[in-house]
């Protein structure tokens, strides 16, 4: 999320101009600690409705780094609005996910549009969460301005 961008910030070198990498199992954990200390010192808190990532300190950041190295992956951010769209697209297909997992859908679309993901690339998107914030999709669909909203009929 743009409002909770820990992995993207560290992986893309947006903190101290150093790109955090898995480094064959030897990631610079001191960089992670300094990043968290910086957030605390500046009083910076994640700003997202996606409750699964509001903590801003991913419990599995090292697993994420390992996966990025293994897959030659990239890290990007998407807005809360985009995550809601992604969550709704999943819902339109009869499945269910929570808001942060909606980032998977729109993140892939964003990377395709930026031509980072090419037409013939193999892409695997993993949605790790199920719908736990039941009112988020209800509120999304009540607002007909949302891209994929299906408002209730009276």
Give the ranges of each region predicted by the language model.
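Catalytic phosphate/nucleotide-handling subdomain of diverse soluble enzymes
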Residues: 105-154
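Active-site/ligand-binding loops adjacent to catalytic centers
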Residues: 1-97, 140-154
């Amino acid at each position: 999320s743009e409002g909770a961008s820990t992995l993207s910030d560290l992986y893309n070198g947006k903190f101290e101009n150093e790109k955090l990498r898995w480094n064959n199992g030897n990631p610079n954990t001191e960089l992670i600690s300094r990043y968290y200390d910086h957030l605390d010192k500046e009083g910076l808190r994640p700003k997202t409705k996606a409750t699964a990532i509001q903590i801003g300190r991913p419990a599995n950041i090292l697993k994420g780094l390992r996966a990025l190295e293994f897959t030659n992956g990239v890290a990007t951010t998407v807005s809360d609005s985009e995550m809601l769209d992604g969550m709704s697209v999943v819902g339109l297909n009869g499945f269910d996910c929570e808001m942060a997992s909606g980032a998977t859908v729109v993140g892939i679309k964003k990377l395709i549009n930026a031509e980072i993901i090419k037409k013939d690339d193999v892409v695997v998107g993993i949605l790790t969460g199920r719908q736990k914030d039941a009112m988020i999709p209800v509120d999304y669909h009540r607002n007909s301005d949302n891209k994929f909203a299906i408002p209730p009929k009276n």
